[in-house]
């Protein structure tokens, strides 16, 4: 469905909750973001239990309009730790951490350099039993093959369905088809995918979000 079609829908004829009941179980799981402390009347987020780690520090070749490396500033800096990823995870676990997100800045192809840390992730999984999720950008075939050996809890994957957003916001020489290729690649290797669609990513405008949804629905999640 095109974004413009939203305005033509007669929502008085639609029962959203009935549609939800027909397609999903009664239990809903909510996740609180872990990059910044937050608290509501019903929920208090903890930065200690699930920790984000940047394997590149605050360095990112894309330096895109989405975050201008600011997201990396809220992550633990692995290069500054001057140790291996396993050692950092073990130290975190000793202080109460249950899981980690392995992320970092991208190269010009929007790929986070995860391959040097695959063996450490395997050890974290097998020896420490911690939850491991990764944010890989647009991983190539070799990276997906390696990630499949880690037994990950999930891959956080931004899905973009609009060419202008990819070019103007991410400064990336890629197409929406490249994002679908990565979805196919991860599914083929049996890696659980947690797709993200960022509403208004094109400077606050809705561009390609429906296309991203249509892309995602082709694959089992």
PLM regions and their residue ranges:
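Helix C-cap/helix->beta junction micro-motif
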Residues: 23-24, 128, 189, 219
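Conserved strand-turn element in the central/C-terminal portion of the radical SAM core barrel
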Residues: 182-208
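Structured catalytic core of nucleotide-sugar glycosyltransferases
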Residues: 32-33, 53, 69, 86, ...
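Core AdoMet radical
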Residues: 70-84, 88, 92-116, 124-143, ...
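N-terminal [4Fe-4S]-dependent radical SAM core
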Residues: 3-61, 65-76
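A glycine-rich, aromatic-flanked flexible loop/lid motif
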Residues: 14, 219-221
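Active-site glycine- and acidic-residue-rich loops that bind
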Residues: 135-138, 171-175, 198-214
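Hydrophobic positions in alpha-helices of CheY-like receiver
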Residues: 120-124, 186
